[in-house]
Design a protein with these regions (language model features):
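Conserved ATP-dependent motor core of P-loop NTPases, especially the RecA-like helicase ATPase domain
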Residues: 16-26, 60, 77-283, 515, ...
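Conserved ATP-driven helicase/translocase motor core recognized via long
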Residues: 2-3, 29, 55, 196-364, ...
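Core structural elements
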Residues: 125-138, 188-214, 343-350, 364-369, ...
Length: 658
């Protein structure tokens, strides 16, 4: 990392006294009170800068997070209003610190003025500028429609996948298919590679996710138009020689066995090589890749396999095989160069053509909002000043998931004067598939006016906090990337009920690492996951038994299943743990992406509703009673006689007398 890009030292943030100007980056590790501090910054900006609720821009990346921030900030304002009216902080450290600092004797704001500003903000809080990134961009563009160069009436779409694919199909038809018709070998290569309009669409989607990235085509040479003909000529020569000399080659190799390496060129391997060459020539494709087994009969492979002091078997075919391998590689490189040339042309023209089609059809996607605002800010410098006057201060939440385009927008509007606060934790970056880029976070930190960390973990116990500090600080490059560092945190002062486990035979410890039993064989990933799930379920079952006996508890309260969380890396692993827990008779709730309508509970509810809808249908009744909710076994269901069901002629609804 260059000296210019090296991040400055981070200071521990005291949110109630830090300067409210410039560009500030705050690294907020998990559990350190990120939202609490955002609320404090918001209140200080509102009071000390005399800003309205609609003037402080707060941006986060999901609608759920936006709603949470909205309610948390409103709640803080209401608490503060009550404290100013009554003179009582209610024991809340948030309010107490504000009364000591911003509203204290050393502060420049008297309580009466502060109360007016708080009440003004609460009255107008429905207009608070707390948005997702896309909602902010849309509002900004609506305030400057001519600069945005967007249609006044348009169809907002979540994405432009259908239009992208339409464009890709057109390019495939007009550019790729004519080239494939001219070069049959290229057509075969496209089929073998799985190329098609979908591949073009995927390339364009990646390009649109990072519109500021510079495309570099270094090392992409011009296609060698003679490569296919050279490969065909070499193939014909080799095939002809093989037809004439196969038996002689076989005999030669048998004779040469004593001088050949018996790991790579043992008799069975040479038999496979002979068969592979015969099959390859029978296929008749001059540019097809040589089978791996066939490569054992190239001169290069035979020289390598010859024992020290031995004489390498000699035959013209071995040299021709070497030449054919090189010719096939050259033909492959030519096809690849043709495809890359097409991709380069495609990515050069497609973004502009896609934008033109969208304008014609009055369609705008969410990603277009960002691109259009960025373009408008670059084209019209006055727009940045207009937006800065509209939003004199900004707080960006989850900044680690910001992509280069998003940061460029905020940087253009708010830097260098600010106040702009960028709050996030690079260790929790999860949206790389949406083009979020950790290097954006690191670059922003290098150029920030000030960098802070939140150093008090309010969520975990002191033992867990200490263990995490020792675990991650034992390696100065625990997160690999330069600049992605671990800052030690300390536990908060909140008193928690201690966890007591009187049934644990092992050494006490809040942070433990389990290892699967070792063995001589290879442990497959599938088997390792199954063993881990079983071990996890067994431990939970042990804790639940201890809870029933009063030995496993939180303070004086027996431990309950709801006190236990199992963290996994994938949804599939979560489903595995849930199934294994069920075999132990332990119920669990899985937080997954699947629709609630695809769950087992939904299927059972559907069966019950179907039985209610048709009370005379014995089959539906049996299906409903077989649900887990009723617990009837097969014997009980079979004993249900047709007479047990309601008569089929009963009306579905009984009229209510008027």
């Amino acid at each position: 990392m260059s000296a210019a890009a090296r991040p400055q030292a981070a200071l521990e943030l005291d949110v109630f006294v830090c300067p409210l100007d410039g560009v500030n980056q705050i690294e907020a590790s998990a559990g350190t009170g990120k939202t609490w501090n955002i609320c404090a910054l918001y209140v200080r900006l509102l009071l000390e800068k005399d800003l309205g609720a609609d003037q402080i821009l707060v941006v986060t990346f999901t609608k759920a997070a936006t709603a949470e921030l909205h309610e948390r900030i409103r709640g803080r304002l209401a608490q503060l209003a009550h404290a100013l009216d009554t003179g009582d902080d209610g024991g809340d450290p948030f309010v107490a610190r504000l009364l000591e600092t911003t509203l204290g004797e050393a502060g420049a704001l008297d309580p009466e003025t502060a109360a007016k500003r708080i009440r003004r903000a609460l009255r107008a809080f429905d207009q608070a500028a707390i948005h997702t990134i896309h909602a902010f961009c849309q509002r900004a563009l609506q305030e400057a429609p001519f600069a945005a160069a967007m249609p006044f009436a348009f169809d907002m779409q979540a994405d432009d996948a259908a239009l992208r694919f339409e464009l890709a199909a057109d390019f495939w038809r007009t550019r790729v298919e004519p080239m494939a018709a001219r070069w049959p070998g290229f057509a075969t290569w496209l089929v073998d590679s799985g190329a098609g309009p979908a591949a073009l669409d995927a390339q364009l989607a990646r390009r649109l996710k990072k519109p500021l990235a510079a495309l570099r085509w270094d090392g992409v040479g011009e296609p060698d138009e003679s490569a296919e003909a050279a490969a065909a000529a070499c193939f014909e020569e080799a095939a002809r020689m093989w037809a004439d000399e196969r038996d002689a080659i076989d005999a030669l190799l048998r004779t040469a066995q004593p001088v050949l390496n018996q790991r790579s060129h043992k008799p069975d391997a040479l038999v496979d090589a002979l068969g592979a060459w015969s099959a390859h020539f029978a296929q008749g494709d001059a540019t097809a890749a040589l089978p791996k087994a066939a490569l054992k009969l190239t001169r290069t492979a035979l020289v390598k396999a010859t024992k020290k002091g031995g004489a390498t078997p000699e035959h013209p075919f071995f040299d021709v095989a070497d030449a054919l391998e090189a010719a096939v590689a050259a033909a492959e490189a030519t096809q690849h160069a043709r495809w890359l040339a097409l991709i380069a042309d495609w990515l050069d023209m497609a973004p502009a053509e896609l934008a033109e089609r969208k304008r014609t059809r009055r369609v705008v996607s969410f990603d277009d909002l960002l691109a259009n605002l960025y373009r408008a800010l670059n084209t019209h410098p006055w727009l940045a000043e207009t937006l800065r006057e509209r939003y004199p201060a900004a707080l960006i939440d989850e900044f680690q998931d910001t992509d280069p385009l998003q940061f460029a927008i905020f940087d253009r509007i708010f830097a260098p004067r600010g106040p702009l606060f960028l709050v996030g934790d690079p260790k929790q970056a999860i949206y790389s598939f949406r083009a979020a880029d950790l290097h954006t976070y690191l670059a922003a930190r290098a150029s920030a006016s000030a960098c802070y960390t939140l150093a008090v973990n309010q969520r975990s116990t002191p033992a867990i906090v200490d263990a995490c500090n020792r675990f991650f600080m034992s390696n100065p490059r625990a997160f690999v990337l330069d600049g992605l560092d671990y800052y030690a945190v300390r536990a908060g002062t909140r008193v928690r009920a201690p966890f007591v486990d009187g049934t644990d035979p092992g050494p006490a410890g809040d942070f433990r690492i389990w290892t699967l039993p070792g063995g001589d064989g290879t442990l497959l990933k599938h088997d390792a996951q199954a063993q881990a799930a079983q071990a996890c379920a067994a431990e939970i079952a042990r804790l639940m038994r201890g809870a029933r006996e009063g030995d496993a508890r939180l303070g004086d309260t027996p431990l309950s299943p709801g006190d236990i969380a199992v963290l996994v890396q994938t949804h599939r692993q979560g489903s595995l743990v849930k199934r294994v827990l069920a075999t132990w008779g332990i119920g669990s709730v899985e937080l997954a992406q699947a629709s609630v309508f695809s769950t087992g509970d939904a299927e059972q509810l559907e069966r019950v509703l179907a039985a209610i809808d048709a009370p005379g249908d014995l089959r539906r009744l049996r299906a409903a009673l077989a649900a887990d909710w009723f617990g009837l076994d097969a014997g009980a269901l079979s004993r249900l006689a047709p007479g047990d069901a309601a008569p089929s002629h009963h009306p579905r609804h009984t009229p209510h007398p008027l």
